């Protein structure tokens, strides 16, 4: 089953996550089919906290991909901020 989930990147004490589409059986940071955005939980100042390629997210959801719980929360947050802007 395809899953849209977070893959850990960044450096020590500065986590950075990529939103990736991968098979649910792959390792968290293993191979992925496509990277569709990023999440920076410790963004400061003018740094972008969340970036999502909505067109690709909608495509992967239409072909049956499932989102992880955290990614579902992030997408909901992204939609709220987009609607408010």
Swiss-Prot record:
Any one GO MF annotation of this record: structural constituent of ribosome
Example GO BP: translation
Keywords on record: Ribonucleoprotein, Ribosomal protein
An example Gene Ontology CC term for this record: small ribosomal subunit
Superkingdom as given in the UniProt entry: Bacteria
Family classification: Belongs to the bacterial ribosomal protein bS16 family.
Protein name per Swiss-Prot or TrEMBL: Small ribosomal subunit protein bS16
The organism's taxonomic lineage, starting at the top: Bacteria, Pseudomonadati, Pseudomonadota, Gammaproteobacteria, Pseudomonadales
């Amino acid at each position: 089953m395809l899953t849209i989930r977070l893959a850990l990147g960044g450096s020590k004490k500065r986590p950075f996550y990529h939103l990736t589409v991968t098979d649910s059986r792959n390792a968290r940071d293993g191979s992925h089919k496509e990277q569709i955005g990023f999440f920076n939980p410790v963004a400061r100042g003018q740094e972008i906290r969340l970036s999502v390629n909505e067109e690709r997210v909608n495509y992967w959801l239409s072909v049956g991909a499932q989102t992880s719980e955290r990614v579902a929360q992030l997408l909901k947050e992204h939609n709220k901020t987009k609607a408010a802007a």
